[in-house]
Amino acid sequence: MVPVNPALPGRSYPPTPPYLVAREKIREFASAVFATNPISFDVEAARAAGHADLVGPPTFPIVVQEYTLQQLLADPEAGIDFSRVVHGDQRFTYTRAVVAGDQLTATMTVTSVKSLGAHSMVTAESMIVDAGGEHVVTAISTLVVRGDE
């Protein structure tokens, strides 16, 4: 088994293609995560709460971040065997809510690689911006790459 490349921290990947946040995508995601807030299902409720359209649940940006993680996992120089990856941690830092109609682009940078015995922990930050280049949310994921058993 090839170990995770310890030189990954600081490596950035190209911006993802724009992702159009559609109302139905928000509704589908909200249903899948058992969200109950009406601002994710009802446009009028979202507008009454001061939003332009439906609001994605707090974890919705993972949909956009997954495109950046695909870049990392497909990078042969990363040394990450996807069959050995488990999700260790997830955090989001918001500037504003994700709303239907947003066109979001993400750029990922690997921030750390730590070895824990035979295992590795890879932390990456995905900066997610709107069509105007304004920051919306930063998604931070830690992947655990299991070593040999």
Swiss-Prot record:
A Pfam family of this chain: FAS1_DH_region
InterPro entries for this protein: FAS1-like_DH_region (IPR039569), HadA-like (IPR016709), HotDog_dom_sf (IPR029069)
SUPFAM superfamilies the record matches: Thioesterase/thiol ester dehydrase-isomerase (SSF54637)
Family affiliation: Belongs to the UPF0336 family.
HAMAP family: UPF0336 (MF_00799)
Name the UniProt record assigns to this protein: UPF0336 protein Lxx02810
